[in-house]
């Protein structure tokens, strides 16, 4: 939840292209402070309109056991933002940033719907994982 403290652990990500360069695959690993090593996979490609993106995402801790479909777009520089609803207005927002030539950044936000906001917890996105890795 938004009030949970962040924990710092090693993380890794491998970015590859597939299907003649039309798809990007991002396999990543991270560690949960209580539940140990976790991993995930995002496969991203162009949507039918050519400007938007569509993705399939699965994560051993955040999004399991059924993979989730995300949609989104390219942002400024070498950034992508994807989002999808997983129930009752709750959404995941996943952002990737490869703008810096030395680092790769991934951030997962959980988005709280307005109807679930309280005096203590505001509606809107809050970060649940921020990963920054060096690039090989």
Functional labels for PLM-detected ranges:
Residues 1-136:
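Hydrophobic small-molecule pocket/channel-lining residues, especially in calycin-type beta-barrels
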């Amino acid at each position: 939840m938004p009030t949970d403290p962040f924990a710092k652990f090693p993380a890794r990500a491998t970015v590859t292209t597939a299907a003649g360069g039309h798809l990007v695959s991002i396999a990543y690993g991270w560690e949960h402070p209580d539940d140990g090593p976790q991993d995930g996979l995002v496969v991203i490609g162009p949507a039918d309109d050519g400007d938007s993106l569509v993705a399939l995402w699965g994560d051993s801790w955040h999004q399991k056991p059924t993979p989730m479909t995300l949609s989104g777009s390219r942002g400024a520089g070498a950034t992508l933002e994807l989002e999808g609803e997983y129930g009752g207005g709750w959404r995941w927002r996943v952002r990737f940033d490869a703008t810096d030539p030395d680092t790769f950044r991934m951030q997962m936000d959980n988005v709280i719907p307005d109807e679930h906001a309280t005096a203590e917890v505001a509606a809107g996105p809050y970060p649940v994982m921020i990963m920054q890795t060096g690039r090989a």
